[in-house]
């Protein structure tokens, strides 16, 4: 049968073999259509299979639910039967419990009735007692009726006193206000008076301050004028001292030259007087120098060296002496001492040991002291209007220092009184005395 079927289509297709090429295009469209149909049917088949599977799953779920419901029905039936049995037993138990509770309630009621009967008796006794006390109080009130009238009178008196107290308080408040107003007025008046007094005192103080300032200014001006005059006087004295010092230095140089000339002449006369058969020439010792003759120490020193050393010492000693003596002892020297010092020192210094270092120092000291004494003499003439007490004290001080000055003058005047010294000791002493002058 199958081969026949296959042969049938092949036989039917044989007559159309010639037109197979022309019908190839429509066959492809049909195949496409069939393919689309096949795909659609496949999808529908898959959908049906899925629905079948879902129905099977739902059927299995329903079977399980049916089994669960049957089990629950069985359990519920057993529970209902057990509950019915429990309810029957519970009814029996509740009836017994209610009977027991009722018996207990009756017993408690009897106890409470007996208790409240006793309390009722006590309260009734208290009520009777309170009624008796109320009757007694009413009787006492009737007895105190006159006191009530007195109380009313006292209350009326208290009200009157309260009104009077209120009136007194008002009056007291008004009085306090008046006193306070008067106090404030007095306070303002006193403050004005005090302010006026303070202002007057301030004006007076300002006037006094201005007057004191003017007086102080005038005093300062007077002091400045006096100090200016003193300064001018001191400047003039300083100029005079410098002029005197220059004159003394010139005299000293002149005396030094004269002394050198005299010594040269004496040496020449000695050579002429000695002759060829005279005594041998004098030679300086090796370790010491004689100090008997004044010219022996000054012979080796040249005039230029003596002149260069002497001015260096004289200003250093004369300047501090003059500056220290002038302001402190302006009116303290006596004219007699000044004249004696001037007469005794200056000539002796001009003729003693001009060429040596020690005489130059003594000469500078003597010159500075002489200048200070001259200045003190001038100061004494200028400040003659000072007080007697100051002049007497300065006179005593000058008289006390007189012997020292005279001894110094005599020592400077007599060269033989000087101790013997070597040239090195003289140089050291000159340097030691020159150092304070530089300081």
From Swiss-Prot:
Coiled-coil blocks: 27-74, 121-213
Compositional bias ranges of the Polar residues kind: 338-365
Transcription regulation is among the record's keywords: no
Keyword Lyase part of the UniProt annotation: no
One Pfam family linked to the record: DUF4515
Keywords: Coiled coil
Bias (Low complexity): 9-23, 376-392, 428-439
Region described as Disordered: 1-28, 276-439
Superkingdom in the source lineage: Eukaryota
PANTHER family in the cross-refs: COILED-COIL DOMAIN-CONTAINING 166, COILED-COIL DOMAIN-CONTAINING PROTEIN 166
Name listed for the protein in its UniProt record: Coiled-coil domain-containing protein 166
């Amino acid at each position: 049968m199958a081969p026949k079927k296959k042969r049938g289509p092949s036989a039917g297709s044989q007559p159309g073999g010639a037109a197979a090429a022309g019908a190839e295009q429509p066959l492809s469209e049909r195949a496409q259509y069939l393919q689309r149909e096949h795909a659609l049917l496949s999808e529908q088949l898959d959908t049906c299979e899925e629905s079948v599977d879902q129905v099977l799953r739902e059927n299995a779920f329903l079977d399980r639910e049916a089994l669960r419901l049957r089990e629950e029905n069985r359990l519920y039936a057993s529970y209902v039967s057990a509950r019915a049995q429990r309810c029957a037993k519970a009814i029996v138990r509740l009836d017994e419990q209610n009977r027991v509770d009722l018996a207990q309630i009756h017993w408690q009621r009897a106890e409470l009735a007996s208790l409240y009967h006793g309390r009722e008796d006590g309260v009734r006794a208290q009520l009777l007692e309170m009624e008796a006390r109320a009757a007694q109080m009413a009787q006492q009130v009737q007895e105190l009726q006159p006191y009530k009238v007195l109380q009313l009178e006292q209350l009326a008196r208290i009200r009157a006193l309260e009104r009077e107290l209120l009136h007194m308080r008002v009056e007291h408040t008004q009085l306090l206000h008046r006193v306070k107003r008067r106090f404030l007025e007095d306070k303002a008046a006193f403050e004005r008076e005090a302010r006026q007094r303070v202002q007057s005192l301030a004006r007076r103080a300002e006037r006094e301050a201005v007057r004191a300032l003017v007086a102080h200014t005038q005093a300062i001006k007077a002091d400045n004028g006096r100090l200016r005059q003193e300064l001018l006087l001191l400047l003039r004295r300083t100029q005079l001292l410098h002029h005197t010092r220059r004159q003394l230095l010139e005299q000293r140089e002149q005396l030094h030259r004269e002394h050198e000339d005299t010594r040269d002449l004496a040496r020449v006369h000695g050579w002429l007087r000695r002759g060829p058969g005279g005594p041998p020439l004098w030679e300086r010792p090796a370790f010491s120098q004689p100090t008997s003759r004044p010219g022996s120490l000054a012979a080796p020193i040249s005039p230029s060296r003596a002149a260069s050393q002497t001015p260096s010492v004289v200003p250093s000693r004369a300047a501090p002496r003059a500056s220290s003596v002038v302001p402190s002892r302006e009116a303290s020297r006596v004219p007699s001492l000044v004249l004696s010092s001037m007469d005794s020192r200056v000539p002796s210094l001009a003729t003693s040991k001009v060429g040596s270092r020690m005489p130059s120092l003594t000469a500078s000291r003597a010159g500075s002291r002489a200048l200070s004494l001259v200045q003190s003499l001038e100061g004494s003439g200028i400040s003659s209007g000072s007080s007697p007490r100051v002049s007497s004290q300065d006179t005593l001080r000058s008289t006390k220092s007189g012997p020292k000055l005279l001894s110094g003058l005599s020592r400077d005047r007599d060269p033989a009184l000087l101790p013997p010294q070597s040239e090195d000791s003289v140089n050291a002493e000159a340097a030691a005395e020159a150092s304070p002058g530089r300081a």
